[in-house]
Amino acid sequence: AASMQKQYPGNIFDFSVRHMENSEAINPNDLADPDSLNRYVDGGGYGLSPLGYFMRGAGPVDESEMPFQNNIEAENKADLLIKPIAQVKEAEYMPHKETFLLPDTTDEFIAEAKYNIMKYGAAGCAYYSYDPLYNMDKNSFYNNQRGTYQNHAVTIIGWDDNFSADNFVAKPPADGAWIIQ
C-alpha cells in the first residue's frame, strides 16, 4: 500500500480484508479443491499467508468488491475470482525476533521496525493474545511473559512514543506503543 500511495498521491486505498481471509481459507463445499489451504475462515492463519496471497496475484482487491462482514462463513471459490487492483512484485522481510516487545528488545531493532514502517507503510507481526492482559478502556495490550507462543497476527501501521505505560494492564518498562490493525 505504501508503494501505491507514492505512485498515486492523494488516492486512498481500502483493500478487502474479507477477500484475503477467504482466499486463504477453505470452504467445506470446496473440499475437493486440491489448491485449498487446510483451515477455515475463523481458524487463524500463518504469518506469511498474506504474502502468498499478494505474490500469487490473488489480491489485493478493493473493499467495495467484497465488503467486510462479521461472520465466519467461507465464500465459494467462484465468489473470490475478482481481478486485483494492483500487483505486488516484491516484499521486505524482517528477521523474526522473539523479543520484539519484551523489555530487553534492542533500541536498534525498534528503530529498524520504525524505519520499515515509514518506508513500506506497515509491518506484520505476531504475538500471544491473552484477554486478562488487554485493557479495554485504553485499547491496549502488553504481554510481559516470556516463552509464550504466538496466536494472533496484526499489522503495525505506526507508533506513539508518548503512550503512557500506565495505560497497560501489565506495565511495560517505558512509555510507547505500536499502533496496529
Predicted regions and their residues:
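Alpha-helical support elements that line or immediately flank enzyme active sites
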Residues: A1-P9
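Predominantly the structural core of cysteine protease catalytic domains
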Residues: H19-P173, Q181
